[in-house]
């Protein structure tokens, strides 16, 4: 009888405390899986911190995805422009200035596609962490792209598509965003006040850090810049896409 009572008590203690109504449970709460069980206040505090970090990472991933598209498009534009004859560029921009620029354009044209992808990933990772001050470094390719676009007026319109590697990376990033959004949605469905507040604070912090971006660009060549100049609602990877 004592052994049976001990087993019954142990089973009762191991029960997950779940409610479909708003609650402030801390001990014996379970989230997503039975293995994610908080039997101490320390574990529950760790779960709150983890939920906070999860939402912050989701916000960073959203910014990184947009920035990767911007960096990739900028380098693809330069590589496409480098395939044109330099005659018009020399006439309109001057032979002295054009000589070094043409050599640089040739370097972009000969750049392997995998290297273009890696450089775009590197720059996206760096720029996604910019919070204060100038949004971008003063890089040669930014000035080069604006100069070439202002001098080359006879460019045939063309659609620039990502390479297979670029597309696979973009798909992978999207799947991560999509998966994180549903995990966060499931955490909200436990209606635990502490977890929901932790997620909301994570959204505030993540949005504040990673989404401080220009509202737009002013100037004739503003559209040629590689900065992120939009923050559309459709660009956020929220749940239930």
UniProtKB/Swiss-Prot annotation:
The chain crosses the membrane at residues 42-62, 160-180, 183-203. Keywords: Copper, Copper transport, Cytoplasmic vesicle, Ion transport, Membrane, Transmembrane, Transmembrane helix, Transport. The keyword S-adenosyl-L-methionine does not apply. GO terms for biological process: copper ion import. GO terms for molecular function: copper ion transmembrane transporter activity. GO terms for cellular component: cytoplasmic vesicle membrane; endoplasmic reticulum; plasma membrane. This is Copper transport protein CTR3. The lineage of its organism: Eukaryota, Fungi, Dikarya, Ascomycota, Saccharomycotina.
